[in-house]
Amino acid sequence: SAASDVYKRQDLSYYDRNYTKQELFLNNYTYTNATLNNLWANLYTGIDRANSFLEYIQGSPIDETLIAQYMGEVRFLRAYYFFTLSSLWGDVPLRLKSTRDTDMEALQMPSTPAAEVFDFIVTEMEDVVGQVRTADQLNGPGRISKSTVQGILARVYLKMGGFPLYKGKEAFEKAAYWARKVRNSRLHTLNPDYKEVFTNLS
């Protein structure tokens, strides 16, 4: 199931004998599972913060070039959070305005079909590719680079090619297109040693 993918095939799910994680591993979870509830809440917290940022940044005295870059990074993060949500839960509320705890109408917003959520995701990510900097222009990890957006776009299209959207060949071709963008940038290399996958910074 989608939810069990969070901890699927991981010995770490048993390491600390965390019952809520064991429920996922054993496909024996319910709507009360704390791990899933926390993940859902944290992703929507990130989305709400992104919405607030986008609503208020325009009035900032920050340099316009930096504003454009920051907006691109935040729009990407918001789209990525929706990608994570829809990959795990399918239809989810596509909340694009900041909310308050007392705004019951916004808090009870109905789910949006997964197809529409994914359309929003790719539209946003493709739109911000030109707003963010390349990896060699950033001072170390921790920021959203052009190849970050391109690499995640490849993953999004791979997901769209299979369940539940089944876009097939067209989606897979777009996944290959964005993956080639990362490769052809020549800003990234594969780790020569498998263990370095777990020790090196991405």
Model-derived regions: residue spans:
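Extended ligand-binding clefts on enzyme/binding-domain cores
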Residues: 1, 184, 188-202
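Short, small-residue-biased leader/transition segments that mark boundaries at the very start
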Residues: 2-7
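TPR/Sel1-like alpha-solenoid repeat signature
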Residues: 75, 150-156
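Short coil/turn linking the two alpha-helices of tandem helical-hairpin repeats
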Residues: 86-87, 93, 159-168
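Conserved, well-structured interaction surfaces
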Residues: 15-89, 106-119, 125-141
